[in-house]
Amino acid sequence: MFEEDNYEENVKLFEKVISAQAEELLSNEDLAVIYIGRATCPFCRRFAKKLSGLTNKISTTIYYVDSADFSDNLIDSFREKYNIVTVPGFIVSKNREIEVRCDSSLSEDEILNLLK
């Protein structure tokens, strides 16, 4: 039977921020994990479900930027700066070294390895 994924339930496990807050986190935190996506994107839905399933294995907050939030005036420049041409976007900043992935097919192990 087809199991419907519930995007809103999955992203509830993340802390929602706007792009300016995400930029601040990437600049100032030793470890920052940012997920960028939207509910209407099937690839985002798949990635958010996978990422939410890892929250108990990740010892840091996952921040969520809704790419469909039209009140976020700086999201286009944020996406351009970090070369997030498609969603889902996944940004990990460790000691201000930034890695960006725009690939919903990342495995759980690949996601965890990015955080090590």
Where are these regions (language model features)?
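N-terminal leader/targeting and pre-domain segments
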Residues: 1-32
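Non-catalytic, surface beta->alpha helical segment in thiol-disulfide oxidoreductase systems
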Residues: 86, 91-116
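Short Fe-S-cluster ligation motifs
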Residues: 70-87
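Short pre-active-site segment immediately N-terminal to redox-active cysteine/selenocysteine motifs
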Residues: 37-40, 86
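The canonical Cys-X-X-Cys-His
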Residues: 41-44, 90
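Thiol-based oxidoreductase modules, predominantly thioredoxin-like and allied folds used
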Residues: 36, 59-75
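Short, well-structured hydrophobic secondary-structure segments
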Residues: 33-34, 43
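Typically the conserved alpha-helix immediately C-terminal to a functionally engaged Cys/Sec
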Residues: 45-58
